[in-house]
Amino acid sequence: GTEIGYEGLLDFDGYINFHLSADDLATLVAQGDIGANELTGETKEYDLVTKDVPGISGTATFAARKSGAALVTVMLDGTPDGGMHPGHIHFNSAAETGGIAKTLTTLDGTTGMSVTHIEALNDGTEIGYEGLLDFDGYINFHLSADNLATLVAQGDIGQNELTGESMSYDLGTKDVPGISGTATFEERLSGETLVTLDIEGTPVGGMHPAHIHAGAVADAPGDILITLATVDGSL
């Protein structure tokens, strides 16, 4: 019996379903958000790159609702028919890793789609579209609920997005012939840096520690200032 009129409906938190028949309400013929859930047209797209399973990649599109909440639509190409792939927004960048901030709707491998309404994190902290664009996080999608260790797609979001500014430095061969490469520094929206080491000639199975040292090579050895991720010779 709650009264509601035109203005109230324009701000109503709701959606409309049309069903196949009175005997088959489970089959929807049409559906759409209304009121506060209407999309404003403002969106932001992030790439989700291939990880442990070759051939799977896609995008995560964040869309603003009139209410300020966000609709997150993930589309992955290459997922297997019948596969069910859990997904989460995590704290920190993908390079740093972090705990789960928000559980996303499980992605259906047959459609390659996951759609999630977000107005709060798992712990109840309120967050909407604008907050997500500045969030210190990344997205993971996993092979299955029983195999979360195997990632099918991953991508940084929010303040961890790369600006496109980068600088590459050559790493020359030293004590082991045939090993050389580059160190690429990329700027994030936050002002932080993603450092990617691309080394050629490393032995399969080798695990090679790396650091940024103080001073110039000519003045080595300098103190270790920053420990970098260990280089996996197999990759």
Predicted regions and their residues:
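N-terminal leader/targeting pre-sequences
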Residues: G1-L235
